[in-house]
């Protein structure tokens, strides 16, 4: 079974204590720099160069929600490319979902191996900067996922989690 690299250099999987959490700002942003979208000498290496803007190898999530407890929806307006960087934003919605954020994910399936991302984690309660692999019902597979998450309330720690057949709750917090 292949994993979808949800190269979701995701500025929000808002999950602080069962919800999106409060913030003094109604809008927060995340700059992410990376090499990308070129293949290197290895046939298994993919890099993304955001100086070229969005790549055809990736998609911007839009029009769906990640549901409870996150209460967030994805919008293409929350993913922009400027000065060689991708910027993901989160803002208040005011409708059925409390927040709207940005997600950028690969279109390709990748197997097991080494994954690497260069990102600047946002420091803000209720926000998570993350990188994860995912496969699930949207790919006609069981829900399997590996998460690497920097929680905005304390960016000196990274949280790891995994799901197998939809069962999670394997969180491990690591001090950086």
Model-inferred region functions:
Residues 11-12, 127:
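Repetitive helical segments and hydrophobic/amphipathic motifs
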Residues 2-10:
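Sec-dependent signal peptide recognition
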Residues 21-24:
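Bacterial signal peptide processing site
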Residues 35-176:
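GH16 jelly-roll
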Residues 26-38:
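Ser/Thr-rich, Pro/Gly/Ala-heavy low-complexity intrinsically disordered linkers and tails
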Residues 16-19:
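C-terminal motif of bacterial Sec signal peptides marking the signal peptidase cleavage site
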